[in-house]
């Protein structure tokens, strides 16, 4: 079929398998260009490995460190009538390129919150790798089905205490609007912590540890975002922030546990990037369009891949073997360049000046839209979008 982008709200409902493959190819090339990562882990599990930072982690481990990788994700395969999800095609492409280089790559597709996912992963590790040296936890799901009760809990992207009103961009109409978001109820806050907090990360590490599949010195990392006062009301000071604080709580408990065998657990605070998740958060697209332009001008812009490469090579697995620098909460900070005072001051000054008319001149909004479409495999250089493509792509993946 010939596949064109179709946008509905924050989601592109179509995906392009060849475009997704080309994206992955580019990320691999970027990783290889940096040269091998010294002291890199050789057996890596990535929970949430099909897009964004999770995919970048798997690519970095495999193509930067030569690691055997297991990826866990929840994606849909394509059929002859309908394309699959971008994450399916990303994972298929990763698997193809890893195997071409003789790297071990296996994937599990299903609900990572489930007990079955953890058990199947443990069985696979025991069977193929024995133990693992690193666990990356990169789940970004709006819902969690509780494994014991089957109850489905939903998270909320809402402020706490009062209605939040701010200048935002309507990405469908390319227009500056005033967006208002009602505050979360106590139950919504609690539910957001249940879905997006640190409990499932703990369940994963505890299950892997009890099964004896974590090697001595195993490191685990989970991803977070703090941002700045421009986004705090909806993010860090909102329901989502409460969940991210719970991630810090979990990191402390897990670090204590893993330290007995020479391991570590850290939250890595990353920079804002264009992802399906961030596009759904009011004000984030406008903020990202502003901050990207300034960071590009300053020569410090990074995408997902550059961020994770820096985390591996300059934080967790440094060439001299020294311990990673952390903040007062034991977090790895990769948002340091974004939070530079000159960059943030630029955004603060610019925010009130942006209108629908000057949006494309004052910010990198055009690039934001291009990057958003690229998430789904569209607008990628070197891809013929008028060509007939097969949406059915198979690879080495087992259902959970």
UniProtKB/Swiss-Prot annotation:
This is Enoyl-[acyl-carrier-protein] reductase [NADH]. It holds the Pfam family Enoyl_reductase. NAD(+) binds at residues 48-53, 74-75, 111-112, 139-140, 244, 273-275. GO terms for biological process: fatty acid biosynthetic process. The active site is at 235 (proton donor). Belongs to the TER reductase family. Pathway: Lipid metabolism; fatty acid biosynthesis. It comes from Aliivibrio fischeri (strain MJ11). Substrate binds at residue 225. The keyword S-adenosyl-L-methionine does not apply. It comes from the Bacteria. One of its GO terms (molecular function) is enoyl-[acyl-carrier-protein] reductase (NADH) activity. The record marks 75 as: Plays an important role in discriminating NADH against NADPH. It is an enzyme of class 1 (oxidoreductase). HAMAP family: FabV_reductase. Its EC number is 1.3.1.9. Monomer. It catalyses: a 2,3-saturated acyl-[ACP] + NAD(+) = a (2E)-enoyl-[ACP] + NADH + H(+). PANTHER family: ENOYL-[ACYL-CARRIER-PROTEIN] REDUCTASE [NADH]. Involved in the final reduction of the elongation cycle of fatty acid synthesis (FAS II). Catalyzes the reduction of a carbon-carbon double bond in an enoyl moiety that is covalently linked to an acyl carrier protein (ACP). Keywords: Fatty acid biosynthesis, Fatty acid metabolism, Lipid biosynthesis, Lipid metabolism, NAD, Oxidoreductase. The lineage of its organism: Bacteria, Pseudomonadati, Pseudomonadota, Gammaproteobacteria, Vibrionales. InterPro entries: Eno_Rdtase_FAD-bd_dom, Enoyl-CoA_Rdtase_cat_dom, FabV-like_NADH_b, Trans-2-enoyl-CoA_reductase.
